Amino acid sequence: HESSFMGVFGSDEEAAHVLSAIKEIGLDNSHSRFEKGENGCARVKIDEGDRIFLGSNSGGVTREYPIQLTEEDREYLNQFELIHMGLYSHVNHLLEELQNVSGKISYDFSDDFTEEEVQRAIDKVDFGFFSIEDFSDEEVKQFLMKHFCERNDVLIATRGEKTAIGYDGAKFYEVNPVLEEPVDTMAAGDSFLTAFLLYFLEGDDIVTAMKMGNEFAGKSCLVDGSFGFGIHYD
């Protein structure tokens, strides 16, 4: 599968490290922006395999210099079957404009969304992902039903070690996670949604795609930093 990244890079060591990882992977970032300042960065600690956020710079240059699409960007985006963004991408201002692209739109609402943020985006995306660990099964189902709208294909709530629940407007789908002794749970949710979307868009049913998402998330929890490329810093 071919993929690319369109974002805003800073001018610090963190930016240089991310760019070197992207280059080594072979990920296209030809439509990214480069600005002077801090790259988006979060500080975390790992406690018995669980990642705990200590703070961040709120997106750094991604927040300070939000992307405005050019005509070349729009033509480029139309090459893709799927465009993924999230609550921390600082691109909500593009949601209306992206209604004109040919591909599906996926959105990660993460775990600290507000009702206002959900309402602002939910009717403009095909796939919505939520991290909701403290809700009961019934509360999750009520939440997904409440927010599902005509535009949506599938909404999914992942819940750590609990059952992931999906909803397509007619039926709920529940899949148990693949439980491994984690090395680092960083980006487990991102891994889930990536695999889910790939399999679902290739024609697999929702349950099969969710199972593949759980399997890939389990594997990513066995890798430091979710995909490696770690460096030491002070």
Model-identified regions with their sequence ranges:
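Short catalytic-loop micro-motif centered on adjacent basic/acidic residues
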Residues: 4-7, 82-85, 105-108, 129-130
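Short, well-ordered alpha-helical microsegments
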Residues: 15, 91-95, 114-118
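Active-site glycine-rich loop that binds ribose-phosphate moieties when present
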Residues: 62-72, 86, 108-117, 138
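Glycosyltransferases and closely related glycan-assembly transferases
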Residues: 78-79, 92-105
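Conserved phosphate/ATP/ADP-binding segment of small-molecule kinases
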Residues: 99-105, 109-174
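Conserved phosphate-binding/catalytic region of the ribokinase-like
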Residues: 141-234
